[in-house]
Amino acid sequence: MSEIKIINAKKIYHDIPVIENLNVTIPKGSLFTILGPSGCGKTTLLRMIAGFNSIEGGEFYFDDTKINNIEPSKRNIGMVFQNYAIFPHLTVRDNVAFGLKQKKVPKDELVQQTNKYLELMQINQYADRKPDKLSGGQQQRVALARALAVNPSVLLMDEPLSNLDAKLRLDMRQVIREIQHEVGITTVYVTHDQEEAMAISDQIAVMKDGVIQQIGR
């Protein structure tokens, strides 16, 4: 796990600053939520941390390592999106193992890590199924297991529950909170849902118009 420090971050779209001089420190091992309405810049900031959006100014650190010019695949992050982003042609087991295969980890470690997160996310009974045979909540568990299996330093979650119905959202809040505590990974969670943010977070940053207006517990 890593502390994330962002100093004077700046992002420009079409000559218009959408984030300017943003400063925030995200404690190591915490579940830190960025809460705000659509278009406030929260997903843009998340994508800057991930390396998917360019950084027009400022410095981004994981612990003491400046990551501005490190390509996304080398930042050791896990990501979970609202649309699950799991591979429909792979089984649940192969989806969870995908990142480990990409990293070419030894086979015994691959099997051990895959089984660990299948069990932790309570999806081992679906290991040989394809995603289209799973519910939305089960698919999101697969996405979370795949993100965590590679032992990332940082987990980034972009509106991960927005496509689920009300009951599944409540269930998955509990799952995310419990798993994050158990694994202890630094997690940045983006949502527009205040109730959701209050239910799962160690800290909440309220964002509007590209500015973090308040941080609280």
What are these regions (language model features)?
Residues 6-9:
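Conserved catalytic Walker-motif region of ABC-type ATPase nucleotide-binding domains
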Residues 35-37:
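The feature captures the beta-strand-to-loop junction immediately N-terminal to the Walker
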Residues 43-46, 142:
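ABC ATPase nucleotide-binding domain helices that frame the ATP-binding cleft
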Residues 50:
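Helix-to-loop junction immediately C-terminal to a conserved catalytic motif
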Residues 58-66:
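Conserved ABC transporter NBD signature motif
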Residues 75-78, 82, 86-217:
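ABC ATPase nucleotide-binding domains
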